[in-house]
């Protein structure tokens, strides 16, 4: 697969007192390739700064064409490709390094926002059998920081980047919150990746 497309897919480790992160489990179950694209998989820490540095380094050393970062958005009912990232870190809880920024820019002097460079509408359409919709806010925690930082770093290059949030999974036992079967998340993300490699 030397001439094929390469997609870096990342998941986060557990955070906020959880023992698991559904994205880490979904990542393990994703295929090694989708369509003609080879997947490069990595689990990254739920930490401001380090997560971004790690993903940029992985993307550059593997010479990937696209980056799809996965994250947990507890309380959402849908798999949600993110349309936009904003230039602020405003954490309701500390990250896994104990850092809790309040109203700090991701990039000092950077633009207010960046749009994802992945085809978010096509990704949602490809997930037709799974509950999926475009999200217009990625929050202000580590996920948004990662997406903003990637879009800033790779602006003007051929490397496309985006983020997909997923719901809690049943194993997390959130009786009062929407949950999704892990298998359904894996299926949805696989289809979304198919749309990325086809675009």
What do these predicted regions represent?
Residues 74, 167-170:
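Glycine-rich beta-alpha junction loops
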Residues 51-53, 145, 173:
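Short, solvent-exposed polar/charged micro-motifs at secondary-structure junctions
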Residues 17, 143, 169-175:
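Short active-site-adjacent structural elements
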Residues 2-140, 152-156, 177-199:
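N-terminal catalytic or cofactor-binding beta/alpha core of small enzyme domains
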């Amino acid at each position: 697969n030397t001439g094929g497309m390469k997609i870096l897919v990342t998941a986060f480790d557990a955070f906020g007192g959880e023992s698991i992160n559904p994205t880490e489990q979904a990542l393990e179950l994703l295929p090694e390739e989708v369509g003609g694209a080879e997947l490069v998989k990595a689990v990254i820490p739920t930490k401001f700064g380090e997560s971004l540095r790690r993903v940029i380094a992985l993307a550059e050393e593997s010479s990937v064409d696209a980056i799809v970062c996965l994250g947990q958005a507890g309380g959402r009912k849908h798999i949600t490709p993110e349309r936009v990232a904003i230039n602020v870190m405003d954490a309701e809880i500390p990250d896994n390094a104990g850092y809790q920024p309040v109203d700090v820019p991701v990039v000092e002097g950077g633009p207010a926002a960046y749009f994802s460079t992945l085809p978010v509408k096509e990704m949602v359409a490809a997930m037709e059998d799974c509950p999926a919709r475009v999200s217009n806010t990625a929050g202000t925690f580590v996920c948004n920081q990662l997406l903003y930082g990637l879009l800033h770093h790779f602006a003007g290059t051929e490397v496309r980047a985006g983020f997909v949030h997923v719901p809690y999974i049943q194993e997390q036992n959130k009786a009062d919150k929407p949950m999704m079967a892990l298998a359904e998340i894996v299926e949805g993300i696989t289809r979304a990746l198919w749309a990325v490699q086809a675009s």
